[in-house]
Structure formats: structure tokens, C-alpha cells
């Protein structure tokens, strides 16, 4: 009798599992059909278009709400325009709460659900779009298997460390090609605001410069840019920030010292664009009686960069060991979000300008390019290098009207030029333009709004 009871119990458990699988498959079918019904999508184009016929796994990493899904929707629109049927599009967003309990074993149900919907369509003719798939543990094993066995048209997006280039190179074993996504560029910002950026009349130029001033202090997150009400924009930004704080940091890494983490983030925000000593911040936090270890702060700094809240660059040096020992400079993912978290300060204009320049460089530098900063007797904000070759030196300043500032910026970039043997020098300002010739070298000075278009 005991054996019979055990057997019956196993049968009941198996029945429940099968019912759960059937229910999950039905949900997957519903999600697939819902996304197909939305095609074509009503979206505003971005500067960088994803390839439609790439024989690799296209990965789209980026911070939350920066437009990763929109880029995939634009690809789908292009595919449909090229004659691909809607039924050949398989889109799944794994941030749907009904999929939160999915495991890597359940991912095969995605293929089963699609096959049951369209048994006549070969998987090799399907274009698969997996949004936020990194929420499923070991997702990469499924993606690589599908790519090698069934389909070579796969697009995946995500907003945490698992979508970083270093992770992708290892995880996808050379099958992936990366297209990082950021909040809107200045050109995209103008497009979203219906502001012309080419063939400008005098009135257009005035409007463009005003748009730049707004862009430098406001948010570049797409949804926020399109929102007209200031109060709603602020609520959206607070919501984005809290999602990063709690979902990407506190929950993911089991951080219990939330108040200390908030303070640490604000310290990095305040020290924007300057070399930052984690050790100095640690001593400050400890002096206030807050309990945290130095190792915690170093880990938190890593986590903040992994979730794309911050971007950090190292000091230029030819020694990899020295590079790791030097202080990093931290930049924030969005000026408007920083303004929403901190009280805006009038002297922040230069910081915000340099922050936007760094973001623009990240959008436009090649995969093999590296961005560092120069610090010797004097300083230069950005050194753009590829392997051992220094491509460009960039200095950023709000204005060069002041004689002391002018000399500091020029002398800093000249010292960097001598140290790196690079004569391609650029100074980016708020609204000044000229060409400086000194020491038989030429330094171009250009307004940020013009440089970014």
C-alpha cells in the first residue's frame, strides 16, 4: 500500500508539472501573437540602425528605458518592409511578470509554442527577438543552441552585467555582435523634438542652440523627452532611478545597507568627471558612523557600472598594472536623472557638458577604441586610443573667456600631446569656435552642439 501511495503521489506531481507547462505554453503563444498584432510599430528612428541580415547573435546591452526594445522594433519594421511576414517574427519580453518563474529548461517551450502556432514555418526562416532575456538564468546556453541548431536571426537585449561585451564574448563564444544603446544623442533628441539639424536658417540655428542648452541639463531618456509635463518627467526619472537602485542593485546583489548605498551613489554623482578615491569616500562614510567595508564600496562601484548607471574611465598609462591602481573618473548615464536625484547647482554646467561629451564618445567610438584620461603635471579630459595608437585628445570646458581657464586647457592638452605623440587635438566648449596655433601645433575649438551633429 505504501508503494502505491508513493506512486500515486508521483503521478499527481507529474500531472501538476504537465499542467504548469501547458499553461506556460499558452501564455507564450498569447505573447507571441500579441506582439505580431502590433506590427508595424510606431517608433521614431534612432541614429544607429541594427542589421537585418546579420548571421550572428545581435546583442543590445544598455541601461533601463534607453530604447533597446525600440531598436528591435525598428529592425522588425525594416524586415516587414523587405517582405518578411509578421508570422515569421517571434518576439518575447522576459520582463513580463507571467514569465518570472521561467527556467532555462522552460525556454524550449518558446520554440514549442511557436511551432504549434505555425507548424508550416521552418525555424530557420524565423527572426527571434528576446527582450531582457538575461532575467532567465543560463539563458546563453539556450540562445547558442538555438543559433547553432535552428535559427541564425537572433536579437537579444538586456540591462545588466550579463549583456556587457566581456560577458558576451565569453558566454556566446564568438557568435555574438554587440550594439550598445544609450539615452538619446543630441541629434536624436532634436529628432524627437522636431527640431531641424541640417540646412539651417537663422531662426533654426537659434532654436538649435536653445535645444542644446536644454539637452545639456535635461534627461535624454526617450520617454522622458517626449513627455511635456515637467512633474511627470521628474516622476519618470525617479521611477527609473529607483528601479536601478532596487532591482539592479539591492535585490540582485542582496545589499542590506540601502541608505549607505544611496549616499555612495550621490558622492559619485557629486564628484562627476574628477578622479575619485573610493578610499576617501570610505573614510568619510566611516566618520559618520555608518557600517560598511571598503571591499563593499569597491564592489558597489563595480555593480553601478555593470547596471550602466555609471561609466568609468581609467588614467592613461602604458602599464596595465598602474592603470588598475589609479583612480577612476566616473560619469553618469543621464544628466537629467542626476539633476532629479541631486539639487541642481549653477556651477554644474561644465560637469554636465563633460558628462555629455563622454556619453557621445561612448556612442560613437569603435569597439576597439578605449577612452582614458591624461593626468601628469597638467590634465587632459579624454585620450582616445586604439591598441598602442592614440587617435585623438579632447579637452572640455564651458568657456575659454577667462585667461586662466584658457591657459589651463591649452597647456593641459599640449602636455598630453607631447606625452602621447598625438597632434589631433580638440577643445569642446559651450559656444566658442576658433583655431589655435601654438608650438607648431593646431588645436581646434568647437561648440558642443556642432561637434555632436
Language-model-detected regions and their locations in the chain:
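Conserved lysine of the Walker
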Residues: 68
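Interdomain motor-coupling "hinge/lid" segment immediately C-terminal to the ATP-binding subdomain
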Residues: 24, 33, 167-275
Amino acid at each position: 500500500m505504501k508503494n502505491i501511495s508513493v506512486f500515486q503521489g508521483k503521478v499527481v506531481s507529474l500531472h501538476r508539472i504537465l499542467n504548469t507547462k501547458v499553461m506556460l505554453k499558452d501564455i507564450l503563444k498569447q505573447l507571441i501573437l500579441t506582439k505580431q498584432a502590433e506590427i508595424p510599430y510606431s517608433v521614431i528612428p534612432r541614429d544607429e540602425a541594427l542589421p537585418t541580415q546579420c548571421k550572428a547573435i545581435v546583442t543590445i546591452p544598455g541601461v533601463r528605458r534607453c530604447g533597446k526594445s525600440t531598436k528591435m522594433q525598428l529592425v522588425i519594421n525594416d524586415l516587414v518592409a523587405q517582405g518578411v511576414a509578421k508570422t515569421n517574427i517571434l518576439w518575447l519580453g522576459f520582463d513580463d511578470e507571467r514569465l518570472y518563474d521561467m527556467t532555462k529548461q522552460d525556454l524550449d517551450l518558446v520554440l514549442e509554442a511557436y511551432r504549434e502556432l505555425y507548424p508550416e514555418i521552418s525555424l530557420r526562416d524565423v527572426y527571434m527577438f528576446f527582450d531582457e532575456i538575461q532575467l532567465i538564468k543560463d539563458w546563453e546556453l539556450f540562445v547558442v543552441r538555438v543559433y547553432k541548431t535552428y535559427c541564425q536571426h537572433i536579437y537579444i537585449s538586456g540591462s545588466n552585467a550579463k549583456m556587457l561585451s566581456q560577458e558576451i564574448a565569453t558566454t556566446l563564444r564568438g557568435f555574438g555582435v554587440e550594439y550598445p544603446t544609450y539615452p538619446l544623442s543630441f541629434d536624436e533628441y532634436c529628432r524627437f523634438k522636431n527640431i531641424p539639424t541640417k540646412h539651417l536658417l537663422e531662426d533654426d540655428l537659434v532654436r538649435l542652440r536653445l535645444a542644446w542648452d536644454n539637452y545639456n541639463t535635461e534627461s535624454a531618456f526617450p520617454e522622458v523627452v517626449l513627455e511635456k509635463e515637467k512633474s511627470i518627467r521628474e516622476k519618470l526619472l525617479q521611477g527609473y532611478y529607483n528601479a536601478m537602485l532596487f532591482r539592479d542593485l539591492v535585490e540582485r546583489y542582496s545589499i542590506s545597507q540601502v541608505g549607505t548605498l544611496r549616499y555612495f551613489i550621490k558622492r559619485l554623482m557629486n564628484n562627476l568627471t574628477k578622479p575619485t578615491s573610493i578610499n576617501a569616500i570610505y573614510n568619510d562614510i566611516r566618520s559618520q558612523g555608518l557600517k560598511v567595508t571598503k571591499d563593499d564600496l569597491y564592489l558597489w562601484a563595480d555593480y553601478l557600472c555593470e547596471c550602466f548607471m555609471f561609466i568609468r574611465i581609467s588614467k592613461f598609462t602604458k602599464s596595465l598594472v598602474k592603470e588598475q591602481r589609479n583612480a577612476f573618473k566616473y560619469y553618469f548615464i543621464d544628466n537629467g536623472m542626476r539633476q532629479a536625484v541631486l539639487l541642481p547647482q549653477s556651477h554644474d554646467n561644465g560637469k554636465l557638458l563633460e558628462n555629455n561629451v563622454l556619453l557621445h564618445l561612448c556612442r560613437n567610438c569603435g569597439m576597439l577604441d578605449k577612452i582614458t584620461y591624461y593626468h601628469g603635471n597638467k590634465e587632459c579630459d579624454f585620450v582616445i586610443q586604439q591598441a598602442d595608437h592614440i587617435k585623438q585628445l579632447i579637452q572640455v570646458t564651458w568657456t575659454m573667456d577667462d585667461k586662466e581657464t584658457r591657459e589651463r586647457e591649452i597647456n593641459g592638452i599640449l602636455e598630453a600631446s607631447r606625452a602621447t605623440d598625438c597632434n589631433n587635438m580638440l577643445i569642446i566648449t559651450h559656444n566658442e569656435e576658433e583655431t589655435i596655433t601654438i608650438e607648431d601645433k593646431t588645436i581646434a575649438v568647437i561648440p558642443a552642439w556642432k561637434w555632436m551633429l
